[in-house]
């Protein structure tokens, strides 16, 4: 998948500096640092790091936030959208990669503080939520969504 992505970028005339993907694991818990593939200095100093609807799939969302903030420049922004806490759903378990049934504002705030991205922290609930068709069987569930942001300390 990554090779195809990089090939398509190159075919569009984009340089490696403009668009390029690498394979790596930022949240490997078996070591203090991510894989060697992610050690290149060009993979640090970002203006923004985002996770869209994914933190509830990580076994350790706090570690994910830590590792993302490490890659931001001072003043860079961590931006996350995900679900607020909700009850478990029948048949939608860890088999589908759901590790957490939403994240509370308190947990997200503590996560940003721990990661060093608490400056200007805000968490907003977006609209009236999101309706999701689970498993393509017509069973719809509604989830409240939040958008959280914070800046890495200078």
Residue ranges and their predicted role:
Residues 53-54:
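Short catalytic micro-motifs in class I SAM-dependent methyltransferases
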Residues 6, 58-63, 88:
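Short N-terminal helix/helix-N-cap motif within the alpha/beta-hydrolase-1
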């Amino acid at each position: 998948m990554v090779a195809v992505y990089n090939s398509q970028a190159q075919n569009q005339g984009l340089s490696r500096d403009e668009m390029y993907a690498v394979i790596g694991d930022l949240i490997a818990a078996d070591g203090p640092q991510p894989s060697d593939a992610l050690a290149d200095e060009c993979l640090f100093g970002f203006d923004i790091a985002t996770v869209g609807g994914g933190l509830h799939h990580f076994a350790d969302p706090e570690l994910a936030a830590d590792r993302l903030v490490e890659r931001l420049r001072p003043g860079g922004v961590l931006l996350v959208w995900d679900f607020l806490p909700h009850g478990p759903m029948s048949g939608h378990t860890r088999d589908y990669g759901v590790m957490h049934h939403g994240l509370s504002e308190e947990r997200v705030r503590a996560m940003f503080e721990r990661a060093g991205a608490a400056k200007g922290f805000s968490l907003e609930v977006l609209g009236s939520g999101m309706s999701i068709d689970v498993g393509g069987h017509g069973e719809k569930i509604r989830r409240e969504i939040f958008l959280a942001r914070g800046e890495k300390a200078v």
